[in-house]
Amino acid sequence: MTQAVILHPCAAAPLRSKAGPRGTVGAALFLGCLFLSCAGPLQSQAARPVNPAGATAPQATLARHYQDGEKIAYTISCFNQGRAKTTAYEARAEGVVRKDASGVFVEDLTWADLNVNDEQVRLSAASRAFREPLSLAQGAKLSLPDLSSVQAALLDPISDLLAFYADLKIAMNQHTLTRAGDHAYVAYGAPISWADGKHVILGQDAVDFDVTLQSIDPATQIATVVVRHVPPAQPQIKLPASWMSERVGNTANNWVQVEKTPYGKYIAGVGQETFEVRIRIAAATGRIVSATLDNPVAVVERACTDAALTACGAPERYTLGRQITLRADPTPALAPALAPAR
C-alpha cells in the first residue's frame, strides 16, 4: 500500500477522502440537535477515581451561568494541508447574551471578519446580518437557523463553532463530572450519514463519546474538559464489501464512503475516525476560554469498476485530518448593574 498524510479542509463534520469537506452543517446540527435534544438513546457510564483517605480535590460543576448583556467574542481558526496545497481560515464572531422568547439565555452571535488563506473575504450584507444563537444553559437546545443566505466561505466557521458547543454541552449533561479525573462514557454508535445520493452514494461514520474532566487549576480556576469521539465496539455503519471489514486501525472501522465518478467507476474508502476535543472553561461561569479539536481519519481506499465493490484496484492508505482552535477574545466589562443570572 502507498501511504500519504492529508490534513483535510476544515469542517465540523468528519472528512471526505479526496475532494474536501462533506456534511459540514449536517453533522454539526446532528451533534447539536439530536444528541442533545433527544438524549434518550444515549447511555452514560460514569466512573470516579478513588481519592486517598483525607485527601481533597478541587471541585466544579460544569454549568454555564450567564449574565444578561454579557459580551462574547471568539476567534476560530482551521488549518488544512492537502496533497497539492495548504488551506486555512480564521474568523471572528461577537455578540451579546440575551433571553430568547422562551426566557432562555442565548449567545446571539454575528460574524464580523473572515480570512481564507490569508486573504480577507468581504462578507455580504446577508452574512453580516446572520445571527448564530448558541446556548449552554440548562435545557437549551442547539440548532442552526436558516443558512440559505450565508455565503459559502462562512459555513465552516459557523458549524465548527457549533461543534465545540455541542461537545461542551455533552460534557455538561454528565452531572457526575465534578472533580478532576471524573470520567463518563456516553454510548451512541448509530451512524451519521452525509451521502447526497448522487456523487457520494454512501457516507457514514459512528462514534461514542468518552468525556473526562481532566483538570481544575486552583490558581486560575480554569477547568479543562476532554471529549473524545471514539469508535464504538460495534459501529453500525454499512460496509458493502467484505474487504471493508478488515481493520484499518486498532478498532473496528467506523468510517465509510463510496463516491461514484462521472465515468461510472467507484472510489470506496473505509477507515478509523477519532476526534479529540479539549475545552478550557472558567469554572465559576462555564464560559469557554479556549478550545482545540484534532480529527484524524486513517483510510484505506480502492478504485472499483462495479457497484458491489468487488472488482477493485490495489489499496491506497492515507490519513485525513484537521486541526481547529478557538479562543475567547477580550470584551468590554459588564456594567455594574448587571447581576449574575443562574
Descriptions of predicted regions:
Residues 1-21:
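N-terminal secretory signal peptides that target proteins for export/translocation
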Residues 26-37:
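Bacterial N-terminal signal peptides
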Residues 32, 42-44:
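Cleavable N-terminal signal peptides
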Residues 36-41, 78:
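Hydrophobic membrane-targeting alpha-helices
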Residues 45-342:
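Signature of exported/secreted
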